[in-house]
Amino acid sequence: MHSEEKYLHIPNNTKYPEIIVEEEEEDPSEEERSELSETDDVATPLRPSDTFPFKRRNSPCSIKMSEEHLKRLREIACPSPTPTQCSTVSKHEFQNWRINEDVMKDMMHIGTICERENVCKTSKYVYTATMASYTVTEWKLKEGNTPDEIEKISRTIEDLCQLRHKRLAPMYGYHWRLETELMVFRAHVPSGTVADLVKVSAIPQETAVRYIVHVIDALAYLHERKHVHGKLNASNLLLTISNDILLADPFIEGLPSAQKRRALLASPPEAFRSLESYPCLTPSSDIWSVGCVLVTMLTRYPPFLEHYMHFHGESLHRELVSEWCTRRQLIYSSQTLIPSASKEICELIDQIFNVDPENRPSAQNLLESHGSKSRKASLRNSLASLTTAKEPDPPKPIDDFYVEREDDEEHRKIEELRELAERGNNEGGFIPFIRWYMSRILIFSVLLVKWIGMVLCAALSLAAVAGGVFFAIFLIYNGIQIACQCSLNEGFVVLIALILLPIIILLTTLCCNNSLDRYHADVESGKVEKSRFVMKTPEKDVIVGGYILVEGSPDHDKPAEVPRKLGISEGLQSTMGNTFLGYGVDKIA
C-alpha cells in the first residue's frame, strides 16, 4: 500500500510550516554523538521552493515514507550545508537578501553602538513587523562607484548571507540607501565582544583556548567553502549568552577599512613583502590572525605592540614592510610572546606563527588537533574544581575584618599618617594653639577671597550698567548746558558718591555674611576637620598660662564615619566571597 502525495504550488511570500522528518533510528557512532551534542545557535531557514509536499488527510500515518521522499524532504528542509539539522524559519530572515524600501519603513533605529567618522557606523535596529533585533553596519563608500562595482559588492554580501554555522554570526541582508551608503544586517548579540573583556583584564588561559577553538571551527567552515574572513580581531568575536563565540563582520571587497591599524598588526609576513602586497586574503593569513587574537586575549595587547606604538597609518605600514623585508628582528614564538603560558598554548602558538605560509597549518588541522584537547581540558578543570572545593569557613568575629588588613602596605601607610597626625594634635603648648587658630583663619580667608571674587565679578557687571547710566546723565547735563547756556548748581560728584557708598557697604557686608555662613556650615559637617590644611582639634585641652585657649575633643566625640568607610571600601573586594560579610556590615553600620 502506498501513501498518495500531492505537490502544490506555494507563493514566495508564504510562511512555511515546520517540517519533522521521521527516520529509522540507528546507533550513532562516537563522532556523530559529539556532533549531535553541540547545539546550533542559529536557525537554518527554508529555501523558497516551487513545490512542497503535503499528505492527504486520509493517508495512514503509520506507513513509512520511501527513501526518495525522505531525500526530497531533506533537500527542502536543509538547503544550506549546516552542521545541524534545523528546519524552522527564523523570524530574522527576509524575503530577499536585498531589502526593499517597504521593509525599511518598518525598521526602527534603537541606538548607535559605535561610529567611525566618514567610514562606518554600527547601530541596533528592530524590525517592528516581527520585533526581531539586528546589528546594522552603515558604510560610507567613496563617490564614483560604477554599477559593476556596486553589483560585485552586492553579490559578495549575498554569498555571505547564505552561510550558516553555529560559530558564525549570520548575515540577513543589505540595503542600498544611496550609491555611497550601504546598510548590512547581521545578528544582534547584546553580550558584547572579546575586545570588551580584554579592555578590563586578560582572559584566563582555559577560556582563551576555548574561544580560539570556536574561532578555528568557524574558519574551517569558511575555508571549506572558499571564503576568507580577512578581518579577524578581538572586536569581531561576539560573545553569546552561553559564553560561546560568534565570528562576525568578514571582509567585503570594495568597502573601506574601519580599523586599519588593527588589521595591519594582525596581518601575516607575506602581506608585507612590498607595499602592494597588503591586504593578503588567504586562509593562511586567517590562521596568522588567530595567533594574534590569542596573544591579545592572554596579554591584552597584540604581538609586539610596544615596538609599533609610535607608528600609525602609512608609517606603520612602511615599518612593517621594512621589518619583514630587511631587519627580521622580531621573533614570533611562544617564548617571546607568552613565556608563562601552558604547554598546549605554546604548541598552538608555535604552530600558528610559521613564517612560511605553505607550512602553516590549516584551520581543519588545528581543529582536529586542539578541538578535542580543549574539551578534555575544560572537563578536567571542572572535575578538579569540584574535587578540590572546600567547605566555607565558619563566620569570624567582625574584629578580624580590620586585623587581617595589617599586612596590606597601603593600609600601613594610612595608619602611619593617622598616627603622625594624632601625635601632632596631642602636643600641648603655645605652638599648637597658634597652628590651630591660624589654620582656621586660613580657611576663613580662602572662603572670604572666594566670595570677594564672586561679588567682584557681579560688581563689575553692575559697574558696566551703572557706568552707562552715569554716562547718559553726563550727556544730558552737557546737553542742558549747551541748550540753555547755563550751568547747573547740583553737585554731580556728590550725587555719584551718595549712590556708590551704600553699594560698597552692602557688597562688603554680603561677602562677610556669606563667608561666615559657609564656614559654620563646613565646621558642622566636618569638612574643615578633614582638610589637610587645617590642624585637627587636639584630644586634650590647649592650656597657656592657666587659661584654656582651645577645648580638646575626646575619642568618643570623634565621628565613626572615617574608619567605617575605610573598612568597607578597602576590604570589600577581599571579603566579597566570605559568608560573614553581611553580618560584618550590619555590625559596623
Swiss-Prot record:
It comes from the Eukaryota. GO terms for cellular component: cytoplasm; membrane. Residues 1-51 are annotated as: Disordered. Disulfide bonds: none annotated. Residues 97-373 form the Protein kinase domain. It is a multi-pass membrane protein. The chain crosses the membrane at residues 429-449, 456-476, 491-511. Expressed in vulval and body wall muscles, hypodermis, seam cells and tissues next to pharynx and anus. SUPFAM superfamilies: Protein kinase-like (PK-like). Keywords: Membrane, Transmembrane, Transmembrane helix. GO terms for molecular function: ATP binding; protein kinase activity. Residues 20-41 have a biased composition (Acidic residues). It is found in: Membrane. PROSITE patterns: PROTEIN_KINASE_DOM. Disruption phenotype: RNAi-mediated knockdown causes an increase in lifespan of about 60 percent compared to wild type but only when done at an early larval stage. Lifespan increase is associated with a decrease in the accumulation of the age pigment lipofuscin, a delayed age-onset nuclear membrane disintegration in muscles and loss of mobility. In addition, causes an increase in lipid catabolism resulting in fewer fat droplets in intestinal cells and hypodermis and lower triglycerides levels. The protein kinase domain is predicted to be catalytically inactive. Belongs to the protein kinase superfamily. STE Ser/Thr protein kinase family. Negatively regulates lifespan and health span probably by participating in nutrient sensing. This is Protein drl-1. It comes from Caenorhabditis elegans.
